[in-house]
Amino acid sequence: MSEEIVVKKILVTGASGGIGKAIAVACARAGYYVIVHYNHGKERAEETLSQIEAENGHGELIQFDVTDRTVCRQKLDELTEKHGALWGVVSNAGITHDNTFAGLSGEDWDSVVHTNLDSFYNVVQPLVMPMCRKKAGRIITVSSISGIMGNRGQTNYSASKAGLIGAAKALAVELASRHITVNAIAPGVIETDMIQDVPLDVVLPTIPMKRLGKPEEVAALAVFLLSEQAGYITRQVISVNGGMV
């Protein structure tokens, strides 16, 4: 009698493009069943899932607003009821609204903090207890080099990303005895739509490797941190930044 093959299931938020898409596709290639999250970018999320399926991977779409705590709880409870405890979650959804602090509106502060930082609680918290009962799991939050060193014109973004690092480190201590790892990835300047307006002649001199990072390079780290081989790595902040820090 052959044993049933158990496919580990993971959720990737903000998986409709950029780093999130790269992580979702790379995870599917590694054999995970990938739950591809989006909010407004349905067509792009469908493209992510289509690429996964075209490469003989498996997954599904899920839609919700990561800033809406009630909806997150409802959707994630339904997801857990359907699939059981997930093996992992990559909390990646994020936005920027840049301005100098003196000119930064309260709305732009709130929207960035709600989307980038509050979403960690809204998405991860409903998934923790099922993981604890199973005594296994991987939690990754995608922070930023801005959360480590701070960037001019990004007090809101830097604050939200630094908050993710603190949350990940604290949660890692709480969950270590349950064999659940919690780590933060802090990308540097990665070639995505988010940096399309950034002048390269200003940015590249600050990067020792003199090039932008690729989403796939961040995704490779995420796949490793999700793996069984990374079971003794927790409470860490690992930056993919070409030597900037």
Model region roles, listed by residue range:
Residues S16-G17:
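Conserved glycine-rich cofactor-binding loop
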Residues T100-F101, D108-V113, V203:
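Substrate-binding pocket helix/loop in short-chain dehydrogenase/reductase
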Residues V124, S160, A168:
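Active-site helix of classical SDR
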Residues S144:
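Residue(s) in the substrate-gating loop at a strand-loop-helix junction
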Residues M129, V173-S177, G231:
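Alpha-helical segment proximal to the catalytic Tyr-Lys
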Residues A136, K214-V240:
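C-terminal substrate-recognition "lid" of short-chain dehydrogenase/reductases
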Residues Y32-E46:
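Conserved glycine-rich Rossmann-like NAD(P)H-binding loop of the short-chain dehydrogenase/reductase
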